[in-house]
């Protein structure tokens, strides 16, 4: 038992430089390690990430579960994934207080680049795409101005944000594709209540899959990793997303 599925999206954009045609991005989010996703499923995670054969690995936040858990075990596995363009991550709402520093240190230890309202450039020959990571997307007072606003419309820009709400809450102009998690695909709670509204103020609009904000910008929302069908998942398999540009 590892990951329920690898969900593949082929994304076309006229903005994409020719040399990035076929570029493969693996995206994993919402691990909640040792809360819903434990040590025995780590080999399955590694196998799925390696099978994705990605050029770039992106992490969408919520690494540690409520029960704690030794995050070094999770990050050791992420470190083993071979991706030519490296691994980048953002923080989720569970990375608060002490958790934030624990995750930051694990990222530093394993060479994962944390993007907090920052943009990095990925080069292929003399062409490039831009990767933008959003710092705490729930705090719009501090983080309500998207870093993409200072970029050029002709650039190809990928945004990594923990919650999909961010692409609707604020102006994310110049973004060509956003990747988000947080919703868990609208899992059923222990009490049998549907919980999508708990995860997104927009109800089921940004629940799972490929959606669009009001400006027509595509956002892919993953169900996440830290779930198991025998625990509290119903019809929402855990997944890794594979985006092919």
Locate predicted features.
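Binuclear metal-dependent hydrolase catalytic cores centered on His/Asp/Glu-rich metal-binding motifs
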Residues: 104-112, 118, 124-161, 167-168, ...
